[in-house]
C-alpha cells in the first residue's frame, strides 16, 4: 500500500508555511517586474515551481538529516527517520520533483536557467552547512531568494534597483525568521552539534533579529517613497510593522513554542506586504 500520508508529511504539504515563505518574495518580484499585472502563465509557472522546489528541498533535507532528526524532539517522527518512507522511495520522489521543476524551467528564458542551477546546488548544500558553518541561515537566504531574479528575468526586466532592494529585503527576512525557527530547536542542536544563527548569535539573538527586521522593513519604505505610492501602501506597511513587533514580543522570553509561533507569524507579514505591493502598483 502506498504511504500517501507519509509522502505528504515528507513534502511538508501538511505544513504549507514553507511554501508560502518561498512564494511571497517571488510574488513580490512578479508584481514589481510587471507593474502589478503579471500574466497568468507566469503566475502558474512560478507557483508550481515554488511548490515543487520547496518539496524537493524538504526531501533533500530529510535525506541528509535522517540520522540527526531522531535526536531532535520536533523531528524524530519524520517519515524517513521513522521508517515510514524508505531511502529509495525518497530518492525516487526527489527525482520526480526535480524533473517537474525542469519541465517548468524550460518554459522560461535561458538566463533563468543559471539562477535555477544555483538554487538547486545551494538547496543540496544547505543541509550539510548545518554541520560545519556557524550561520547556515545565510545559505538558506540565498536559496530562498533565487526566485526573485528569475521572476525579473522571466518578465523581461533587467536586475535593476527594485531587484536589489527586494533581494536585500528577502535575504534579511529569511535570516530573521529562520533564526526564530532555529531558536525552537536550540537546546537539541547544542547537544548534537548542529549549528545555527540561534546558537551563533548567542545572547544577541533577539537584538540581531530586531535589527534585521527594522532594516528590511525600512527598505520597503525607501522603495515606496522612491515610487511615490499611494497612502494605502503605508497603511499596510504599518500593519506589517505591527506583525514584526508581535514577533519580537513572542521571542522575548526565548520559549521554544513561542519562537516557533513567531516563525509561523512570518507568513502573515509576507501576505500583508504582497497586498501592499499590489496596491502600490495599481
Swiss-Prot record:
Cofactor: Mg(2+)
Membrane topology: Multi-pass membrane protein
Entry EC no(s): 2.5.1.39
Transferase recorded as keyword: yes
Broad enzyme group: transferase
Location (main, coarse): membrane
Gene3D superfamilies: UbiA prenyltransferase (1.20.120.1780)
Record GO terms (molecular function): 4-hydroxybenzoate polyprenyltransferase activity
Pathway: Cofactor biosynthesis; ubiquinone biosynthesis
Catalyzed reaction equations: all-trans-octaprenyl diphosphate + 4-hydroxybenzoate = 4-hydroxy-3-(all-trans-octaprenyl)benzoate + diphosphate
Listed transmembrane segments: 17-37, 40-60, 90-110, 113-133, 135-155, 163-183, 207-227, 231-251, 262-282
InterPro entries the UniProt entry points to: HB_polyprenyltransferase-like, Prenyltransferase, UbiA_prenyltransferase, UbiA_prenylTrfase_CS, UbiA_sf
Keyword terms, alphabetized: Cell inner membrane, Cell membrane, Magnesium, Membrane, Transferase, Transmembrane, Transmembrane helix, Ubiquinone biosynthesis
Family designation: Belongs to the UbiA prenyltransferase family.
Name the UniProt record assigns to this protein: 4-hydroxybenzoate octaprenyltransferase
Species, as recorded: Legionella pneumophila (strain Lens)
Gene name tied to this protein: ubiA
